[in-house]
Amino acid sequence: METQAIVRGVRLSCDKGRLVADLIRGKKVGLALDILTFTQKKAAGIIKKALESAIANAEHNDGADIDELRVTSIYVEQGATLKRFSARAKGRGNRISKPTAHIYVTVGN
């Protein structure tokens, strides 16, 4: 039995999110939460909230035992890019791109 949590449109580069997601893929949820708690990256806090949501979904909707849950799959996909403008000298301008990401976390036995 698998349960999923999805976080969309997070202001995070998908490459930076994938670095953290690779740390917890396949681990038990208790160990994964500990890893995320002590990982000093912005993505760790965001992925931790998504994992906690998936755990709560599994417990509430399926009546799953938290001690037996594992992170069966986690992946971070690229979302829409916010394009911004930065004024430069002599009437020019540069484009600033602010990437977003979608995070998918699945927990199961």
Swiss-Prot record:
Gene3D superfamilies (UniProt xref): Ribosomal protein L22/L17
InterPro entries: Ribosomal_uL22, Ribosomal_uL22_bac/chlpt-type, Ribosomal_uL22_bac/org-type, Ribosomal_uL22_CS, Ribosomal_uL22_sf
One of the record's GO molecular function terms: rRNA binding
Cellular component, GO annotation: cytosolic large ribosomal subunit
Superkingdom of source: Bacteria
Coiled coil stretches, renumbered: none
PANTHER family to which the protein is assigned, alphabetical: CHLOROPLAST 50S RIBOSOMAL PROTEIN L22-RELATED, LARGE RIBOSOMAL SUBUNIT PROTEIN UL22M
Subunit relationships: Part of the 50S ribosomal subunit.
NCBIfam families named among the record's database cross-references: rplV_bact
Protein name: Large ribosomal subunit protein uL22
Taxonomic source organism: Leptothrix cholodnii (strain ATCC 51168 / LMG 8142 / SP-6)
Source lineage: Bacteria, Pseudomonadati, Pseudomonadota, Betaproteobacteria, Burkholderiales
